């Protein structure tokens, strides 16, 4: 019986190592090649095609230099103020989120950095399990080790969800404001950043209570952001 358990454990460890080598290989490749669809994008496309087999995602890759500095500043101001300084994990932000959730008695805040969000979007499903959190942490370390901050941010800006089937800065800019990502104004960029925590909801409720207030707060913080 113990030999059977050992073989099962060995097989699981081998599968874990092989999967993470596969992930690492992709990340190394992405140093100078752009990713195609992320795991999360594929998951959302499958969801949309359950209702409409012809459904397609709105997505177009654009280089880092073709994205407005306003949007770059707005997202860091909203999602990860210490992005250029930390190594993938903002421990102060995690502690603050934990204390806020503890005080409210439910999860109302997250401490995920841009690198952690990217790890989830690129490789993981939307489910929440201890295994997924462990894998997210490992992938985050790989991203931060292999890629520089600018490349991490460029990929993030191009794969982040911004609405029902809307992914990336260029698609979001054209979907909401009928302009390219390079031409976004400060207020437009701040509004897009404000939508990120719940993009499909804000896609359907663009005048939702609190969205305008959050947009103004982000816009005020943008001047203090350091870009990679």
From Swiss-Prot:
Compartments, as annotated in UniProt: Cell inner membrane
The protein's enzyme class: transferase
InterPro entries linked to this entry: Glyco_trans_51, Lysozyme-like_dom_sf, PBP_transglycosylase, Pep_trsgly
Superkingdom of this protein's organism: Bacteria
EC number of the protein: 2.4.99.28
GO terms under cellular component: peptidoglycan-based cell wall; plasma membrane
Entries under SUPFAM superfamilies matching the protein: Lysozyme-like (SSF53955)
Annotated transmembrane regions: 8-28
Pfam families with a match to the protein in the record: Transgly
A biological process term (GO) from this entry: regulation of cell shape
Membrane topology reported for the UniProt record: Single-pass membrane protein
Pathway in which the depicted protein is active: Cell wall biogenesis; peptidoglycan biosynthesis
Keywords of the record: Cell inner membrane, Cell membrane, Cell shape, Cell wall biogenesis/degradation, Glycosyltransferase, Membrane, Peptidoglycan synthesis, Transferase, Transmembrane, Transmembrane helix
Principal location class: membrane
Family as reported in the entry's similarity comment: Belongs to the glycosyltransferase 51 family.
Role played: Peptidoglycan polymerase that catalyzes glycan chain elongation from lipid-linked precursors.
HAMAP family assigned: PGT_MtgA
Name of the protein in question: Biosynthetic peptidoglycan transglycosylase
Gene that encodes the chain: mtgA
